């Protein structure tokens, strides 16, 4: 079945104008559709599981603002709380009682967090936690994993996933080799490689940081024993274990990936969901480590808008919605139905596919599985994914515009939305086979 051609005239006009105003016409690279081809859409509004572009086309959305919209876009209770909060001001630049409330909720939920510091983005949280790892241990080196993305700070732009090329050197011009000299990399799910790095760098490694489920190199789950092995290795070598839960935090369970897998790190970074759609980040962990942070301790970190009342309000209301009984069971059922249907549709069209899901996070690769690390992820047929992405847009489904990004469901996605999405996949896979 051939899908009708969408009218995206206004999107094209706006994007053309944007390219003279902003680098590449966007405020974040993946939005430019470079890896999937075609013109990016310019959105006008979002509500629930849907997004509308400036030409009036409606889409079922599986990006969810790249993760925050777990309750659905513009949830009425979140909007109502924000409307009330904004009457009191948008930012105080001073302590705010709402910070206490959200901090208590995060500490109660996340096993590793005994104290928390709010910032304004996941990148900012990861930058701060890197400094904290070094300050606490007195060591400079850090281990990260190929394909894991921890924001755009210089130190982390090494084999960083999110479509960034993996060259073994800094992944962006402007990042000095001296800056990344202390960044050690290993393949995800490879404990032996981590053991080797510790052996080659005795008493020099401050810690290991990773996405407990990789979401920026597609969707890659930890193999049994991998997270547990990292926990043992870091303890053995006096290093810290850090989970970057910017994506997984409050998404795959109320306590994040660490609660889901039963492995407690020393420090955790968060973002996305805890801001309910507003800019936010956080890092937290053991009290003895967090007390290194200024003004309690000597490690300096600050932020003009950190802990602002609007982000705190949206975060509080979002977590209140998520802790209601049955929330994660519903998210799991929705996402499992979706990914099972996607794999069935690809197989019916004679296309190779592998993929999976955990709660409200999913992903697939257009190749034979298994995919256990970034090197194996690169076997996916990115060109065919681009064709799939365009075919799905024509049928009213908005997927991440990259073969190397996880997808997200929400409490707002209905059975009808899932079935409409799967029908679009059936038609699209048949079209591109």
Curated annotation (Swiss-Prot):
Alphabetized PROSITE patterns for the sequence: AA_TRANSFER_CLASS_3 (PS00600)
CDD domains: OAT_like (cd00610)
Location in the cell: Cytoplasm
Keyword field: Chlorophyll biosynthesis, Cytoplasm, Isomerase, Porphyrin biosynthesis, Pyridoxal phosphate
Enzymatic reactions: (S)-4-amino-5-oxopentanoate = 5-aminolevulinate
UniProt keyword Cytoplasm present: yes
Coiled-coil ranges (or none): none
GO biological process, one term: protoporphyrinogen IX biosynthetic process
Residue list for modification N6-(pyridoxal phosphate)lysine: 272
Entry keyword Acyltransferase: no
One Pfam family named in its UniProt record: Aminotran_3
Entry's Gene Ontology molecular function annotations: glutamate-1-semialdehyde 2,1-aminomutase activity; pyridoxal phosphate binding; transaminase activity
GO cellular component: cytoplasm
First-tier enzyme category under EC: isomerase
EC identifiers of the protein: 5.4.3.8
Cofactor(s), names only, from the UniProt record: pyridoxal 5'-phosphate
Gene3D superfamilies, per database record: Aspartate Aminotransferase, domain 1 (3.90.1150.10), Type I PLP-dependent aspartate aminotransferase-like (Major domain) (3.40.640.10)
Signal peptide segment: none
Pathway listed: Porphyrin-containing compound metabolism; protoporphyrin-IX biosynthesis; 5-aminolevulinate from L-glutamyl-tRNA(Glu): step 2/2; Porphyrin-containing compound metabolism; chlorophyll biosynthesis
Assembly: Homodimer.
Family: Belongs to the class-III pyridoxal-phosphate-dependent aminotransferase family. HemL subfamily.
Name the UniProt record assigns to this protein: Glutamate-1-semialdehyde 2,1-aminomutase
Species name: Synechococcus sp. (strain WH7803)
Lineage: Bacteria, Bacillati, Cyanobacteriota, Cyanophyceae, Synechococcales
